[in-house]
From Swiss-Prot:
Source organism of this protein record: Tupiella akineta (Green alga)
InterPro entries in the record: Ribosomal_uS2, Ribosomal_uS2_bac/mit/plastid, Ribosomal_uS2_flav_dom_sf
NCBIfam families: rpsB_bact
Gene Ontology CC terms, in alphabetical order: chloroplast; mitochondrial small ribosomal subunit
UniProt name for this protein: Small ribosomal subunit protein uS2c
Keywords: Chloroplast, Plastid, Ribonucleoprotein, Ribosomal protein
Subcellular localization(s) per the UniProt record: Plastid, Chloroplast
Gene3D superfamilies in the cross-refs: Glucose-6-phosphate isomerase like protein, domain 1, Helix hairpin bin
Listed GO biological process terms: translation
Lipid biosynthesis as UniProt keyword: no
Similarity field: Belongs to the universal ribosomal protein uS2 family.
PANTHER family for this protein: 30S RIBOSOMAL PROTEIN S2 PROKARYOTIC AND ORGANELLAR, SMALL RIBOSOMAL SUBUNIT PROTEIN US2M
Top-level taxon in the UniProt lineage: Eukaryota
C-alpha cells in the first residue's frame, strides 16, 4: 500500500483512490513536455502514465508546505478557470476560507493589484446600493446598467473581493490555461503549487504535483487534500493566537499586582 510512505500529514488518500480517479492518466505521448520525464512511469496506447508514487510524494510535500505556511498566517488563492473545474475551485476555496479566481484571469490581477482593488471597491459599492434598495430609486435604465456592471464585476471578482492584499501562495489548476497567472506570480515572487499534467513545464512551478489535471475525480481528490492541509494550518494559527492572547493577559495581570 502506498500509505506506507510515511506522509507528513495524516493523509487518507490511497493508491486505489488515485487509480480509480484516473490520476495516473497523462496526455498523448506526442504532446508531452520532456521536462516531465522523471514523473512518467510508462507509455500505454500512446498515452503517458504518470508515476503515482511521485504524485503521492509531491502531494505530501505540498501539503506540508501549505500547513506550515498557513500556520503563520499566510493567505491562499486558488486559480482554475477551465469550465470543468471552476465550481470545484470555488467550493474548495470557500470550504477553507481562502480566495479564488474561477471565471477569467484579468490581466494584471496581481501585478496591477491597486487597479484591481478599485474595481473591487466599485463592486462592493454596487452590492451595498442594491442591498439597501437604492437602485430602485434611480431611473430604470440607469439601474439596469449598474446591475449589469455589478454582475460583470462579480463574475470575475467575487472570489477575491475580500482579499486585502496579494496572496502569499497561489494554487493553480491547469498550467497551460493559467499561464498569465503563472507569469504574474513569477514576477512578484509569489510561491505557486501547481497540478502538472504530462504536457506541463515543472520549471514554472515552485511546488507541483504530477497528476491528471483534466479529470474531475482527480482534481477533487487533490483539492480535498489541499483543503485539509489549509484547515490544519488555520487551526494551528488560531491556537497560536489564543496562546499569545492568554500570555499577554497573564503578563498584564502580573504587572498590575506589582
Amino acid at each position: 500500500m502506498i500509505t506506507k510512505l510515511k506522509p507528513y500529514l495524516q493523509m487518507t488518500l490511497t493508491l486505489e483512490q488515485m487509480v480509480a480517479a484516473g490520476m495516473h492518466f497523462g496526455h498523448q505521448a506526442r504532446k508531452w513536455n520532456p521536462k516531465m520525464k522523471p514523473f512518467i512511469y510508462a507509455q500505454k496506447d500512446s498515452i503517458h502514465i504518470i508515476d503515482l508514487i511521485s504524485t503521492y510524494t509531491h502531494l505530501n510535500e505540498a501539503s506540508k508546505f501549505l500547513t506550515d505556511s498557513v500556520s503563520i498566517g499566510q493567505k491562499i488563492l486558488f486559480v482554475g478557470t477551465k469550465k470543468q473545474v471552476s465550481q470545484l475551485i470555488a467550493k474548495a476555496a470557500l470550504e477553507c476560507d481562502s480566495f479564488y479566481v474561477n471565471g477569467k484571469w484579468l490581466g494584471g490581477q496581481l501585478t496591477n493589484w491597486q487597479t484591481i482593488k478599485l474595481s473591487i471597491q466599485k463592486l462592493k459599492s454596487l452590492e451595498t446600493k442594491e442591498r439597501h434598495g437604492l437602485l430602485g430609486k434611480i431611473p430604470k435604465k440607469e439601474a439596469a446598467l449598474l446591475k449589469k456592471e455589478k454582475e460583470k464585476l462579480g463574475k470575475y471578482l467575487d472570489g477575491i473581493k475580500n482579499m486585502a492584499s496579494i496572496p502569499d501562495i497561489v494554487i493553480i489548476i491547469g498550467q497551460s490555461e493559467e499561464i498569465n497567472a503563472v507569469r504574474e506570480c513569477k514576477k512578484l515572487g509569489i510561491r505557486t503549487i501547481t497540478i502538472l499534467d504530462t504536457d506541463c513545464d515543472p520549471s514554472l512551478a515552485d511546488l507541483f504535483i504530477p497528476a491528471n489535471d483534466d479529470s474531475i475525480s482527480s482534481i477533487k481528490l487533490l483539492l480535498g487534500e489541499f483543503v485539509t492541509a489549509i484547515k490544519k494550518g488555520q487551526q494551528n494559527f488560531a491556537e497560536k493566537l489564543l496562546l499569545s492572547s492568554d500570555l499577554k493577559k497573564q503578563i498584564k495581570k502580573q504587572r498590575s499586582r506589582r
